[in-house]
Amino acid sequence: MSRIGKLPVSITKGVKVELKDDKVIVSGPKGTLEQKLRPEVTVSVDGNNVVVTRKDDTRPSKEMHGLYRVLINNMVTGVSTGFTKKLELVGVGYKAEIKKDMLVLSLGFSHQIYFKTPAEIKVEVPAPTNISISGSDKELVGQVAAKIRSFRPPEPYQGKGVKYENEVIRRKEGKAAGK
């Protein structure tokens, strides 16, 4: 990971990076994110770049070096442009809608699923079979999308379920009829 770690993170316009104690705080038009740092890495702001350096050349230090560089890069991208994941509902009668602050899913069960999203995440339903999840925290956007997908993951025989927008479902052949 050190090849990634040695690249500086460029700070886009409108984004502010602060270093406090053992935390990196990135704020921008889409919000504020903070990341606690491990002792293996040090972070410095050099003009319009954030530079991540490691203390020594041990394997854990090299791993943390690349990891924290990518985490800070994702924070800068998140507060400036944000992240979006899109889900599709495939199946007869599968639909989603938003009621108040809850996402209501009808996924072929005998009951509807009510999902309360975190305050930092924006969930939109442009069509009854499409869900768009957006926010500034890449990890949280991915977690919410994975949680919604876990209610009815796509099955390999007919492809029904909740899937990511460009996800390819490996299909299986059904039972072959005997004589």
UniProtKB/Swiss-Prot annotation:
This is Large ribosomal subunit protein uL6. Belongs to the universal ribosomal protein uL6 family. Pfam families: Ribosomal_L6. GO terms for molecular function: rRNA binding; structural constituent of ribosome. One of its GO terms (cellular component) is cytosolic large ribosomal subunit. InterPro entries: Ribosomal_uL6-like (IPR000702), Ribosomal_uL6-like_a/b-dom_sf (IPR036789), Ribosomal_uL6_a/b-dom (IPR020040), Ribosomal_uL6_bac-type (IPR019906). HAMAP family: Ribosomal_uL6_B. Gene3D superfamilies: Ribosomal protein L6, alpha-beta domain. NCBIfam families: L6_bact (TIGR03654). GO terms for biological process: cytoplasmic translation. Part of the 50S ribosomal subunit. Disulfide bonds: none annotated. This protein binds to the 23S rRNA, and is important in its secondary structure. It is located near the subunit interface in the base of the L7/L12 stalk, and near the tRNA binding site of the peptidyltransferase center. Keywords: Ribonucleoprotein, Ribosomal protein, RNA-binding, rRNA-binding.
